[in-house]
């Protein structure tokens, strides 16, 4: 007999038996139990006497009832994670009981030691290959062992020879500033010897990889470069731009090869096809117009066909194709679009054809990428729906593996940004080199590595601090991938191990970090190049950097930004030399300021390598810039006496004489006259070898842009001779590939293409796994039906419309059409071209700089193509379309045989008059405030009967009318087994923007007996259609209809169009035989007008006795109000709480009336004025407002209280949809919603103001904690500051920290530094509306190019919509010099206001003005951080020293403090109004206290629900602290435009005893806080020194908290972090509305009145900040055009122009006494809220966004296709921001320039 088992063994046997019993092995369990009992292996039991007894297995189970059958399994599952904490396994997340070594569950520390091989181990071969290193081989193998082994075996593994750790030796060779704007495109040529960069300054530059030299500049584009591609033969480069043009250059000579014009909007991606079939090649381009063009070209002649094969994929207005990717063999190309559809085209036929449309994604497709190898037809797609999909063609269909970004590594508890981002989105996708893994970048800053075959998550890579939009796989090493993002970080990752190898942070000295926009590996993998937001090219590689040390840090050619002239075909010539840019002489190398580099650098220019020294000295001259100033510039090359023309010499001599005369007269010009004159009279520079330092020189004047404005007149000697042209045409910039290399690569691509065709053919013949649904899209052979039309010229000037109007009109007069011809018209997808049949016109001068912005925004999301500014024509006539087929006659015959295809023409978003097109408006059935039986308007909580027959009829009607695209596979009857009628309840409602506006419902099944939800649900979309019967019927109406039990012959009446119609029941039979039990339209009726129809019983009403019949038989009679009311829904018990519906409705109506008395609720009082803001309806699908809710309450519209609460929530939802989530208007909407919801929920509450006060009091210190936590950031040194520099400045900083007034000098120095920067130029002076008309702002035209008679003075009207608080550096400087700032915080706020205004008024995040704002903001915040920190330290130091003088102060006879006045925010906590001795006398941010103000004009302003589209600029956004002022002189049309307020040089003193008064002498209404009376009494009883101590304490507290807040704000970008409580957004204290206020204190929460006098012509003018304040913009002002996206990295563009606008809003200064006590009550409430809300005004600011990320969808959002699109708890949870707040922001809000409140 075996030995007795131990206790653990016996228990293990028991657990095994229990585990077997719970599984499929029951027989084995029985046998085991028998053996356990037989061998007495079951533990014995003990009785009370201690005797042992045998027991059965059943007894043991009963005794251990707490042990579940799977107890053993659970033990095994828990062992692994517990062991991992002590001894981590080698592969995290793998759970196995059978592991070995470090994967074993029995492992100990000894097993985990790293393995080391000797040299002989490497010399062994395993199956003819070197062995794989074990997982625990930590260190790279010894290179000696590897080399020796390779000598012995003749082979080695690449991972052994070149371990991944070798990439740690990559370093940055050089960072070169070569562009004036952000650089979004970089590419290597096929040899890797050349680098190409494409920038927003419209230039493409060619660089040498080996030494970083600038070799050539390709000019011609008139807008931002959106994408570039180099052909596989290395002979051509193509660049797409926002100017809608694709330009192709020859790489060898830089000569233009083709200008391809086939798009009507910006180019989004461009690709050369890898296919090598014959001599015909393809270049593809996709655009924001929803088209893809296939351009044919000949590989030998490099000639392009003018007419592309074109597919228009615009399923609805505004659809863009955002990304594209070719397969490795070139037989397939896939595209991703904003309509959520992936389209695949096949190039294996004679012409490209579309073969598939994949609609699995539910949001925009932002990235697609084919695999690198042709052995499988696979590609990966990434979408903003939070998933990526790996697609593969199998059995006649494209099947996909879903990669859910919410998936986490098992055993990995990452909680960083991953859990903070609720709405996950894919930003970029990539394959590794061998396609074994797929890498996705997610908007939570993580990279995820997936197995490309199984879809399993392998690694999660963390390290980035912002979104990643660059993923670049190594060209041959599958382990390596590169990532870069807008946080400035560049990472090299090891995909095998999931670890970081190397990272680089792009820190720019004094300017913060530069966001990295693009990266590319060289073909040999030895280099990679990156580009950033500041215009830099970063070169990385192995080896030393000595060759790169020989080049300057800034490299521009002096001809880079010369103006160009264009012909009718868009080819360009240099305006000065009248030569093609590639035939011009070798240029000179200059820095960013336009200063020539020393002669040693000039030899770096191709063509100047062998020049003599005198030929390397550029000729300098003085020319007039655009502002009329004379500046010094390079105008050409210095020549010998015999070569120069007479005219050149005369000009130079006259110039020299003029300069000397000016010097003798003492009138020194702006430029330095420090040059020596050569013998021949030419100017020479004796200091040529002294390099100029950055940010000085020409940019110091603040009037020109260095290389951007070179010269206006080139000397005749610079004209090229025939000999020169021949020599320059032979210059080789980029060599062609070696013939052998080229042949091998072509054979490889050819083989891949053949394999792809073979795979496609084989899979196409296989039997599908299920029947294939026929595609809904049209075949690609149809002809476009758009009318023949010419492109109209608009009446305002843009870069692409500079041709003289006289010539343009005379040449196009015969072919122009009305402006209602729209490029939005539907057209049959077909092969067509877009070549322009313009007559040949003469060369015309393009007077604007080549850097100005493109004509239209291509960054319009779903807003529509060619969207022009509001109140202007928004559509363009399209061009005539011709068939590009060679067999035109055959296709014509085919078309004649087919029926004519016609489609309903769709209009644009806005008509010519600025009115919104009717199809975009919310339909009446949604807007109606009167309850009706039909059409059915859903409300939350409705219990319904759903009729499948009616829903199917609706879908058929939609498809027949082609109203919108319906996916039959997503209909509920195809997803689940639905009966003919279902009892359901509405648990979610969402509206989608149209046309048409769709209602999306989530319907939960109800149990017919209990009435409770079963847990299942489905979703539907529908809208009200004429002649389509409602298929949703209220359960109450359905039950009533069933009880009537209609019989044949019964008379009935029915409501149709608010009239009673009479008829007779003829018969009853099912509407459809397959649904015999359905009541839907089961009655056949005979109307009295002899018509017959099918009716449903709930649409029929009995005829009461005494009913009046119509005079004519068959006519109708109107429905009375009483009859209509009787037919409405009757609330059930409990649906309105404890009260009746009437009682609740009246209570809420009174609450809304009281709520509207508060200023912060007034913006939500009435509907938006769509005539003023026509594009609002394209953003908000379900508009609502407080007045609409009140009307519906009065009409008893809501069926239950939950429906009312749902609509109240939509107020905040609409605000969040239209605005940034942290903008003040959203916070105001949240307050309105929270207060109203709390009031509705508390049925015992009768005063909504009490509810409002309670909500305020609940969270008064919520943001103080943030302030304290952010103080650490402020004290720490910023990145990039060297320790040596800190040590050097430590003594000075220490002294500054002890001087409370040292900040003034520091701020002056900082302001001077800002003035030296070129980026500050647009913000130095306020904008002049006469110089910067509104058209220029919106269309991007330089103001100098607009003649005065063409300028539009209406800028102020447009400007005021976006900027409530104009600000510029000159105003800040005057305020600082006059001593009107009490602390650096106020200085900081005003400067931040400048940046906030710029971002709020710039509709695009990637426009040039936006980039300038980012750079300047980063520079400012980098310096202001230390200033505020020093100030805080000084205040604290002063506080520590103060108690020593306390006794002496108390003994003083003076009751007033003579110390420095406390911070204006110091008394915020005290909440009391205290006048000060020194009253600031600057412009105030409030409404003007003008004598013209009146209650009538105040009411006429018409407060609108229109929401501010704030770009989110931190605490000082224009929406945060503006007073919404209007011009006080509003009766004078000539003075209606904005004007700049002057700042008095010193503060005015006002008596502390006298009250502050308004213009008419009345006392202004105070903004007293909660404890006004008691606090004032306390202050009066307090001694002067005690009061001073109290104020000082509060001041120090403020400084600490505010400084801490600023620590998190000091980043390169910002979002609005201000809470608000004024009339518009509750943003400013009531004081700012009623009284005059110092403009430099506009952020203070401590209420005070600033009385200000300004004497002009002997008159006294009372002004407030924002009152007539002129726009603070300068040269570029607002930029309105969007950019583009390529593969998910799309970005916004911009427009150009500037201007000012008067402040907006409401203020009642001077009229406070006329409104009585109710007004004072409102003021007190508003002030209280303001006080609590402003504690969180500083929020962390996001960094630069991306090229594609800025775009947001507004049209059909397929979220509803997911059954869980709406939460049952919160039906408005339609997506969340990074901060976790619900949002659905759209780019249309930016495009439409709907900035500001609609007053």
Swiss-Prot record:
The family database entries (CDD domains) matched by this protein are listed as:
Bromo_WDR9_I_like (cd05529), WD40 (cd00200)
Phosphoserine: which positions carry it? 693, 884-885, 1574, 1576, 1760
Q: Which residue ranges does the record assign to the Bromo domain?
A: 1136-1243, 1298-1427
The record's section on InterPro entries has:
Bromo_WD_repeat, Bromodomain, Bromodomain-like_sf, WD40/YVTN_repeat-like_dom_sf, WD40_repeat_CS, WD40_repeat_dom_sf, WD40_rpt
Q: Where is this region: Disordered?
A: 766-912, 1258-1291, 1321-1366, 1435-1482, 1517-1723
In UniProt terms, what function does this protein have?
Answer: Plays a role in the regulation of cell morphology and cytoskeletal organization. Required in the control of cell shape.
Q: What is this protein called?
A: Bromodomain and WD repeat-containing protein 3
């Amino acid at each position: 007999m075996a030995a007795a088992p131990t206790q653990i063994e016996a228990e293990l046997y028991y657990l095994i038996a229990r585990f077997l019993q719970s599984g499929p092995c029951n027989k084995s369990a029985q046998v085991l139990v028998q053996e356990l009992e037989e061998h007495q292996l079951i533990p014995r039991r003990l009785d009370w006497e201690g005797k042992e007894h045998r027991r059965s297995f059943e007894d043991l189970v009963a005794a251990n009832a707490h042990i579940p059958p799977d107890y053993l399994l659970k033990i095994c599952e828990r062992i692994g994670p517990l062991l991992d904490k002590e001894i981590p396994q080698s592969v995290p997340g793998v759970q196995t009981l059978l592991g070995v070594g470090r994967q074993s569950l029995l492992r100990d520390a000894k097993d985990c030691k790293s393995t080391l091989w000797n040299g002989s181990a490497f010399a062994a071969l395993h199956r003819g290959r070197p062995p794989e290193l074990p997982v625990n081989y930590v260190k790279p193998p010894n290179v000696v062992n590897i080399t020796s082994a390779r000598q012995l075996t003749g082979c080695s593994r690449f991972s052994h020879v070149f371990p991944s750790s070798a990439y740690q030796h990559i370093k940055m060779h050089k960072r070169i500033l070569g562009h004036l704007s952000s650089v979004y495109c970089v590419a290597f040529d096929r040899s890797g010897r050349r680098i190409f960069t494409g920038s927003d300054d419209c230039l493409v530059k060619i660089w040498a990889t080996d030494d970083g030299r600038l070799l050539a500049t390709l000019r011609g584009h008139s807008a931002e470069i959106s994408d570039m591609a180099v052909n596989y033969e290395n002979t051509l480069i193509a660049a797409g731009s926002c100017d809608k043009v694709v330009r192709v250059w020859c790489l060898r000579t830089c000569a233009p090869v083709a200008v391809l014009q086939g798009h009507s909007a910006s180019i989004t991606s461009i690709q050369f096809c890898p296919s090598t079939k014959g001599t015909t090649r393809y270049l593809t381009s996709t655009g924001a117009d929803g088209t893809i063009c296939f351009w044919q070209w000949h590989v030998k002649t490099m000639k392009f066909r003018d007419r592309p094969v074109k597919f228009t994929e615009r399923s609805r207005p505004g659809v863009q194709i955002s990304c594209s990717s070719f397969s490795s063999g070139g037989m397939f190309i896939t595209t991703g679009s904003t309509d959520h559809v992936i389209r695949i085209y096949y190039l294996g036929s004679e012409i490209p054809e579309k073969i598939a449309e994949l609609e699995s994604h539910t949001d925009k497709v932002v990235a697609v990428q084919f695999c690198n190898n042709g052995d499988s037809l696979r590609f990966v797609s990434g979408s903003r729906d939070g998933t990526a999909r790996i697609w593969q063609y199998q059995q006649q269909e494209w099947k996909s593996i879903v990669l859910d970004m919410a998936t986490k590594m098992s055993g990995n508890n990452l909680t960083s940004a991953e859990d903070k981002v609720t709405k996950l989105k894919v930003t970029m996708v990539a394959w590794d080199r061998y396609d074994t893994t797929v890498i996705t970048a997610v908007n939570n800053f993580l990279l995820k590595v997936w197995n490309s075959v199984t879809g399993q998550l392998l690694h999660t890579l963390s390290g980035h601090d912002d979104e990643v939009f660059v993923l670049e796989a190594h060209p041959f090493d599958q382990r390596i991938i590169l990532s870069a993002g807008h946080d400035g970080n560049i990472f090299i990752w090891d995909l095998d191990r999931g670890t970081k190898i190397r990272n680089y942070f792009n820190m720019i000295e004094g300017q913060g970090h530069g966001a990295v926009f693009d990266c590319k590996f060289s073909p040999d993998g030895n280099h990679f190049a990156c580009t950033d937001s500041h215009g830099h090219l970063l070169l990385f590689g192995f080896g030393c950097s000595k060759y790169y040390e020989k080049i300057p840090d800034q490299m521009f050619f002096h001809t880079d930004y010369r103006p160009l002239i264009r012909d009718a075909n868009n080819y360009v010539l240099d305006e000065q030399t009248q030569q093609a840019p590639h035939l011009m002489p070798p240029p000179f190398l200059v820095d960013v300021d336009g200063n020539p580099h020393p002669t040693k650098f000039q030899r770096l220019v191709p063509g100047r390598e062998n020049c003599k020294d005198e030929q390397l000295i550029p000729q300098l001259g003085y020319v007039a810039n655009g502002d009329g100033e004379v500046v010094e510039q390079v105008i050409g090359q210095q020549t010998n006496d015999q070569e120069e023309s007479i005219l050149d010499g005369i000009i130079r001599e006259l110039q020299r004489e003029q300069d000397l005369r000016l010097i003798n007269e003492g009138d020194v010009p702006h430029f330095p006259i420090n040059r020596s004159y050569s013998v021949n009279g030419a100017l020479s520079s004796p200091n040529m070898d002294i390099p100029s330092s950055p940010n000085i020189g020409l940019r110091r004047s603040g009037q020109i842009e260095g290389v951007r404005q070179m010269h206006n007149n080139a000397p005749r000697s610079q004209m090229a001779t025939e000999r020169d042209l021949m020599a320059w045409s032979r210059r080789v910039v980029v060599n062609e590939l070696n013939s052998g290399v080229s042949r091998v690569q072509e054979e490889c691509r050819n083989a891949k293409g053949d394999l792809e065709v073979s795979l496609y053919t084989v899979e196409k013949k296989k039997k599908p796994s299920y029947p294939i649904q026929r595609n809904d899209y049209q075949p690609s052979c149809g002809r476009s039906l758009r009318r023949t039309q010419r492109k109209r010229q608009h009446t305002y000037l843009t870069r692409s419309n500079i041709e003289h109007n006289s010539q343009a009109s005379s040449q196009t007069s015969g072919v122009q059409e009305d402006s209602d011809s729209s490029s939005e018209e539907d057209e049959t997808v077909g092969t067509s071209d877009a070549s322009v049949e313009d007559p040949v016109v003469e060369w015309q001068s393009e007077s604007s700089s080549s850097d100005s912005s493109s004509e239209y925004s291509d960054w319009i999301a779903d807003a529509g193509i060619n969207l022009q500014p509001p109140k202007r024509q928004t559509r363009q006539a399209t061009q005539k379309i011709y068939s590009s087929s060679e067999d035109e006659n055959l296709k014509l015959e085919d078309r004649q045989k087919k029926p004519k295809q016609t489609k309903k023409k769709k209009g644009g978003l806005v008509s010519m008059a600025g009115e919104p097109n009717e199809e975009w408006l919310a339909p009446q059935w949604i807007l109606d405030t009167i309850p009706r039986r039909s059409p059915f308007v859903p409300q939350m909580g409705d219990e319904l009967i759903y009729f499948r027959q009616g829903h199917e009829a609706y879908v058929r009607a939609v498809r027949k009318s082609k109203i919108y695209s319906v996916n039959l596979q997503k209909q509920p009857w195809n997803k689940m087994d639905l009966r003919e009628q279902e009892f359901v309840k509405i648990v979610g409602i969402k509206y989608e923007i149209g046309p048409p506006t769709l209602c999306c419902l989530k319907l939960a099944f109800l149990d017919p007996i209990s009435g409770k939800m079963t847990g299942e649900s489905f979703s539907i979309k529908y809208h009200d259609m004429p002649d389509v019967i409602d298929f949703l019927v209220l359960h109450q109406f359905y039950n009533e209809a069933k009880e009537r039990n209609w019989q044949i012959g019964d008379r009935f009446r029915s409501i149709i169009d608010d009239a009673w119609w009479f008829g007779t029941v003829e018969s009853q039979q099912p509407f459809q035989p397959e649904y015999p039990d359905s009541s839907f339209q089961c009655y056949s009726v005979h109307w009295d007008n002899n018509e017959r129809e099918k009716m449903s019983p709930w649409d029929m009403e009995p005829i009461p006795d005494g009913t009046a019949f119509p005079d004519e038989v068959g006519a109708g009679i109107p429905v009375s109000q009483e009859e209509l009311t009787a037919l409405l829904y009757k609330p059930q018990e409990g649906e309105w709480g404890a009260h009746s519906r009437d009682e609740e409705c009246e209570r809420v109506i009174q609450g809304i009336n009281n709520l509207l008395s508060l200023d912060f609720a007034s913006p939500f009082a009435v509907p938006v004025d769509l005539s003023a803001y026509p594009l609002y309806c394209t953003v908000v699908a379900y508009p609502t407002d407080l007045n609409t809710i009140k009307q519906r309450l009065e009409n008893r519209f809501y069926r239950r209280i939950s429906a009312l609460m749902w609509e109240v929530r939509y107020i905040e939802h609409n605000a969040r949809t239209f605005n940034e989530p942290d903008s003040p208007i959203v916070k105001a909407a949240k307050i309105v919603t929270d207060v109203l919801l709390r009031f509705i929920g508390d049925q015992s509450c009768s005063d909504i103001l009490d509810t409002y006060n309670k909500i305020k009091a609940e969270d008064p210190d919520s943001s103080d904690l943030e302030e304290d936590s952010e103080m650490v950031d402020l004290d720490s040194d910023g990145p990039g500051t060297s320790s040596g520099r800190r040590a050097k400045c430590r003594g000075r900083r220490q002294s500054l920290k002890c001087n409370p007034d040292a900040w003034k000098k520091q701020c002056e120095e900082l302001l001077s530094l800002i003035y030296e920067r070129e980026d500050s130029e647009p913000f130095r002076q306020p904008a002049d509306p006469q110089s910067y008309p509104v058209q220029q702002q919106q269309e991007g035209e330089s103001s100098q190019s607009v003649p005065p008679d063409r300028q539009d003075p209406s800028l102020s009207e447009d400007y005021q919509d976006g900027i409530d608080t104009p600000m510029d550096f000159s105003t800040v400087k005057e305020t600082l010099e006059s001593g009107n700032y009490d602390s650096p915080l106020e200085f900081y706020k005003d400067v931040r206001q400048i940046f906030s205004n710029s971002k709020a008024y710039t509709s695009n995040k990637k426009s040039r003005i936006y980039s300038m704002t980012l750079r300047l903001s980063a520079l400012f915040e980098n310096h202001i951080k230390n200033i505020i920190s020093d100030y805080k330290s000084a205040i604290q130091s002063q506080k520590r020293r103060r108690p020593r003088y306390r006794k002496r102060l108390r003994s003083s006879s003076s009751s007033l403090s003579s110390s420095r006045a406390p911070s204006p925010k110091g008394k915020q906590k005290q909440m009391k109004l205290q006048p000060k001795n020194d009253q600031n006398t600057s412009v105030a941010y409030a409404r003007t206290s003008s004598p013209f103000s009146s209650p009538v004009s105040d009411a006429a302003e018409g407060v609108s629900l229109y929401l501010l589209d704030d770009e989110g600029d931190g605490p000082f956004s224009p929406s945060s602290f503006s007073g919404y002022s209007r011009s006080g002189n509003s009766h004078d049309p000539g003075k209606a435009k904005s004007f700049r307020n002057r700042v008095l040089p010193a503060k005015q003193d006002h008596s502390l005893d006298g009250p502050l008064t308004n213009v008419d002498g009345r006392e202004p209404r105070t903004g007293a806080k909660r404890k006004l009376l008691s606090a004032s009494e306390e202050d009066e009883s307090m001694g002067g020194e005690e009061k001073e101590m109290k104020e000082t304490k509060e001041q120090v507290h403020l400084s600490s908290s505010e400084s801490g807040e600023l620590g998190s704000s000091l980043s390169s970008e910002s979002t609005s972090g201000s809470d608000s409580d004024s009339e518009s957004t509750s943003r400013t204290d009531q004081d700012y509305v009623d009284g005059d206020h110092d403009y430099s204190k506009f952020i203070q929460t401590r209420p005070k009145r600033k009385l200000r006098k300004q004497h002009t012509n002997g008159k006294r003018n009372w002004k407030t900040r924002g009152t007539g304040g002129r726009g603070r913009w300068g040269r570029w002002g607002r930029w309105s055009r969007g950019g583009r996206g390529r593969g998910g990295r799309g970005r916004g563009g911009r427009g150009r122009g500037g201007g000012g606008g008067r402040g907006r809003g409401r203020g009642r200064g001077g009229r406070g006494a006329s409104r009585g006590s109710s007004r004072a009550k409102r003021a007190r409430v508003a002030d209280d809220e303001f006080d609590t809300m402003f504690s969180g005004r500083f929020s962390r600011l996001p960094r630069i966004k991306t090229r594609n990320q800025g775009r947001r969808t507004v049209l059909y959002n397929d979220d509803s296709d997911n059954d869980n699109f709406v939460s049952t708890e919160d039906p408005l949870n339609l997506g969340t921001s990074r901060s976790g707040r619900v949002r659905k922001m759209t780019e249309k809000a930016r495009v439409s320039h709907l900035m500001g409140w609609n007053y």
